[in-house]
Amino acid sequence: MKLAILGAGCYRTHAASGITNFSRACEVAEMVGKPEIAMTHSTITMGAELKELAGVDEVVVADPVFDNQFTVIDDFAYEDVIEAHKEDPEKIMPQIREKVNEVAKELPKPPEGAIHFTHPEDLGFEITTDDREAVADADFIMTWFPKGDMQPDIINKFIDDIKPGAIVTHACTIPTTKFYKIFEQKHGDLVTKPETLNVTSYHPGAVPEMKGQVYIAEGYASEDAIETLFELGQKARGNAYRLPAELLGPVCDMCSALTAITYAGILSYRDSVTQVLGAPASFAQMMAKESLEQITALMEKVGIDKMEENLDPGALLGTADSMNFGASAEILPTVFEILEKRKK
């Protein structure tokens, strides 16, 4: 299998967050006995996993930065990074972030410059600046592109070189639905049948070098292609999840924090209503729908920054406490503390 990676990534944004580390990359490095994998990041980590753990025999990375200032920081011994991550990553991550931030001050942003700690060629990858060259005869095309609005112009340069049946994936910078539209608008005949072009995601849900997981969107690829990618993801990333394309953003992107809170609330509320009160699931669903729709309507009407002015958080303290039993009781006490702090 040939894997084409379009976009090598840059570590500066990962360092800037102050919370990321190389836990997954170090784990893979130890698993396969190749220390140089320990400080890979972004698509380079995922490419190394696919090559070393899933048997992908050809990996080509395309990025214009290879003709510009592709910078490899070699201040840190891979073995030291691996050892630190066995105990506490924060024993070494502050020094790494400090060095990256220092280099980033003088280095232009992608595609003119990028920060790495391992050169892809040292992992047995081929490199090129030509996307068309990379995607030629590729079975799996993993894109790691800038924000969505820039992607049509990038994709249109190589779309005619994608072979029928190829799997094409996106990550965190565009929804699957919008990603698919780019291909549909240019080559409707290429995507009318899923088996002719399989558009989906290989979304890590976090920085790839930190967590071993991948999320694969269903709806725009054949079942065979999804299953192939799922099996690759399980071998390479350790944990793979299939989900409808429209749920990829709520589950994987920044709003996942809100999705987690909301989903836990729905499940707990459902169980309290159906298991303790004995009400039918249809009633619980009706009430849940009313809550979600009206709170969403309030946010859209007044704006997320003015919600408290229109609904005092304290108004819920004397009503929601009557549902503080069953599964809901596992969540509500903490919720009450938050509402109490925010009430007028």
Curated annotation (Swiss-Prot):
Q: How is its activity regulated?
A: Activity requires salt; 100 mM sodium or potassium salts of chloride, phosphate or sulfate are equally effective. Inactivated by O(2).
What does the record give as the reaction this protein catalyses?
Answer: 5,10-methenyl-5,6,7,8-tetrahydromethanopterin + H2 = 5,10-methylenetetrahydromethanopterin + H(+)
Keywords assigned? Methanogenesis, One-carbon metabolism, Oxidoreductase
Gene Ontology biological process terms, A to Z: methanogenesis, from carbon dioxide; one-carbon metabolic process
Enzyme Commission (EC) number = 1.12.98.2
Gene3D superfamilies attached here? Hmd, C-terminal helical subdomain, NAD(P)-binding Rossmann-like Domain
Pathway stated in the Swiss-Prot or TrEMBL entry: One-carbon metabolism; methanogenesis from CO(2); 5,10-methylene-5,6,7,8-tetrahydromethanopterin from 5,10-methenyl-5,6,7,8-tetrahydromethanopterin (hydrogen route): step 1/1
How is the activity affected by temperature? Optimum temperature is 60 degrees Celsius.
* Known partners and oligomeric status: Homotetramer.
Q: Which family does it belong to?
A: Belongs to the HMD family.
Summarize the protein's role: Catalyzes the reversible reduction of methenyl-H(4)MPT(+) to methylene-H(4)MPT.
- Name of the featured protein: 5,10-methenyltetrahydromethanopterin hydrogenase
Native source species? Methanothermobacter marburgensis (strain ATCC BAA-927 / DSM 2133 / JCM 14651 / NBRC 100331 / OCM 82 / Marburg) (Methanobacterium thermoautotrophicum)
Supply the source organism's classification: Archaea, Methanobacteriati, Methanobacteriota, Methanomada group, Methanobacteria
